[in-house]
């Protein structure tokens, strides 16, 4: 779509059909990137392709399934032979008391929030290397800083993601592969993740009441109730277009 800050770049965005992921994908295309959209829903991917044109390619992908991730990155490799930017945005969460967590509720969050980035980073690094270096932006959460009642598994998975970022940063910095942890606060338009995982109304009401009582909502949402997804997208462009040789290990983004 013409010249831009990301002209000639190839990007992969997970969770690309809703919330911040959708905004990031759209902004990357506006800046001239060829963007591969990874998400589970075929219809929403097709809608994004129609909206963004030939600069966007949707690949139905379950990031928690290693075979699905391999297949997605094989498409990128076959068509582009390189990758410049990986954005791990896909995530899922819902409020549940810790002692009420089912095995499935635990594993669904681990597969999407932690195993997903592990699988995508593993698949992306050879393609980033082929490009002569690039950027991985992994979206973490203020749940690793603030203690949110009833979001224990979400916090655990995001803390694990931050440890992954640290490890990859050390291992691949000599290859000019930069790994940025984006500790993202509340974004307007975000939900409980892009997988359509329904929230229990009773648990949700209890959780929001606790968060209000604990003062967490006021601290993380600020005066405006959260940051816009467009501002989150703008931040992603900044992170991956800053001068080579400049590292941003951890970025904390929130409303005020």
Residue ranges, per PLM feature:
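Conserved glycine-rich cofactor-binding loop
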Residues: 10, 17-18
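C-terminal helical subdomain
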Residues: 177, 181-182, 201-256
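Substrate-binding pocket helix/loop in short-chain dehydrogenase/reductase
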Residues: 97-98, 102-110
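Residue(s) in the substrate-gating loop at a strand-loop-helix junction
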Residues: 141
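The beta1-alpha1 cofactor-binding region of Rossmann-like NAD(H)/NADP(H)-dependent oxidoreductases
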Residues: 61-71, 103
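Conserved glycine-rich Rossmann-like NAD(P)H-binding loop of the short-chain dehydrogenase/reductase
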Residues: 33-47
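Active-site helix of classical SDR
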Residues: 121, 157
């Amino acid at each position: 779509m013409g010249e831009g800050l990301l002209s000639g770049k190839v990007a992969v965005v997970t969770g690309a059909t809703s919330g911040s992921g959708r905004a990031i994908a759209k902004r990357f295309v506006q800046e001239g990137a060829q963007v591969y959209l990874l998400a589970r829903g075929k219809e929403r991917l097709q809608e994004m392709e129609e909206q963004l044109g030939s600069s966007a390619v949707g690949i139905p992908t379950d990031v928690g399934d290693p075979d699905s991730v391999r297949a997605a990155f094989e498409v990128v490799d076959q068509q582009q032979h390189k990758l410049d930017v990986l954005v791990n945005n896909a995530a899922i969460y819902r409020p549940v008391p810790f002692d009420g967590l089912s095995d499935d509720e635990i594993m669904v969050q681990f597969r999407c929030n932690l195993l997903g980035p592990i699988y995508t980073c593993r698949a992306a690094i050879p393609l980033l290397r082929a490009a002569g270096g690039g950027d991985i932006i992994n979206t973490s959460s203020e749940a690793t800083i603030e203690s949110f009642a009833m979001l224990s598994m979400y916090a655990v998975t995001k803390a694990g993601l931050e440890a992954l970022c640290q490890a990859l940063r050390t291992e691949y910095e000599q290859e000019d592969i930069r790994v940025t942890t984006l500790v993202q606060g509340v974004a307007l338009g975000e939900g409980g993740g892009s997988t359509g995982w329904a929230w229990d109304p009773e648990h949700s009401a209890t959780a929001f009441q606790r968060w209000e009582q604990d003062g967490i909502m006021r601290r993380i949402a600020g005066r405006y109730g959260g940051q816009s997804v467009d501002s989150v997208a703008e931040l992603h462009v900044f992170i991956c277009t800053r001068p080579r040789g400049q590292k941003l290990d951890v970025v904390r983004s929130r409303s005020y």
